[in-house]
A protein has these predicted regions:
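Conserved class I S-adenosyl-L-methionine
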Residues: 74-84, 100
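A short glycine-rich, Lys/Arg-flanked "PGG" loop and its adjoining helix->strand segment in the class I
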Residues: 165-178
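Core SAM-dependent methyltransferase catalytic element
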Residues: 200-201, 205-233
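Conserved SAM-binding loop of SAM-dependent methyltransferases across substrates and taxa
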Residues: 85-96
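Conserved beta-strand signature within the Rossmann-like core of class I S-adenosyl-L-methionine
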Residues: 179-186
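S-adenosyl-L-methionine
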Residues: 111-136
């Protein structure tokens, strides 16, 4: 059995490749000037192939970098918010963590998303049991101060509206134990996330990555003892 973690934003990846095909066809038929036609077509093809490469190979190694920077240790209680096919949750469980995961299972955000795909990947990787929940990041069914580490990868930007995104962050904060760590990996709105967390008493550190598609950042946030947040660059 092989792991299949799906294609991130599949309509975007194949959309880029389709646009590249249209530019190539338009150039061959003389509709588009050759220089601009081939150049633009090649650019869209590169974007589409990069998205596919990230989804199929790069993110498999990138997940370990996220977990390492998050300070994951065996026996930690970990929550993966927006787990999808289990990319981070399964890797965390393999490293000895007690993992729970939650998702609303959107096929638009991740191809083939669902519980069945999650379970197939967990079995393929030989990971121990993971508690799986259905639900939204803005309204999670967990008691306050439950987890040592809360992680979220390429999820929060998919939530529409600033207030709703902050509701999701507030929920992650709510279920985090005192002294716990919140790790948010995303492709945009990072200054909003950082500002919200620092205003709520977290010390943050931000990491940038240029091998992901799109380029991404990771915020590692820990509540400061005095409850006043700040940023460490």
């Amino acid at each position: 059995m092989t792991t299949r973690y799906g294609i991130d934003a599949p309509y975007g990846a194949f959309g880029f490749i389709f646009v590249a095909f249209l530019y190539g066809a338009g150039t061959l038929w003389g509709i588009i000037p050759p220089f601009w036609g081939w150049l633009t077509g090649a650019w869209f093809l590169l974007l589409g192939l990069w998205m596919l490469l990230y989804s199929m190979t790069i993110k498999l190694s990138h997940r370990h970098r996220i977990l390492a920077l998050s300070g994951l240790k065996p026996n930690m209680k970990v929550l993966d918010v927006g787990t999808g096919r289990g990319l981070l949750a399964i890797a965390a469980a393999q490293k000895g963590a007690d993992v729970s995961a939650i998702d609303k299972w959107s096929g638009w955000d991740l191809g083939g998303n669902g519980r069945e795909a999650f379970d197939k990947n967990r079995l393929a990787e030989g990971a121990p049991g993971i508690d799986l929940y259905d639900g939204l990041a803005q309204d999670m069914p967990f008691p306050d101060e439950t987890f040592d580490l809360v992680i979220s990868h390429f999820v929060v930007h998919n939530i529409s509206g600033r207030k709703e995104r902050e509701r999701a962050l507030a929920e992650m904060v709510r279920v985090l134990r005192p002294g716990g760590t919140l790790a948010v990996s995303d492709i945009k709105n990072m200054s909003q996330y950082r500002k919200f967390l620092e205003e709520n008493g977290f010390q943050t550190r931000t990491y940038s990555f240029y091998h992901t598609f799109p380029f991404s950042k990771l915020i590692i946030a820990v509540r400061t003892p005095v409850g006043t947040g700040c940023s460490i660059c």
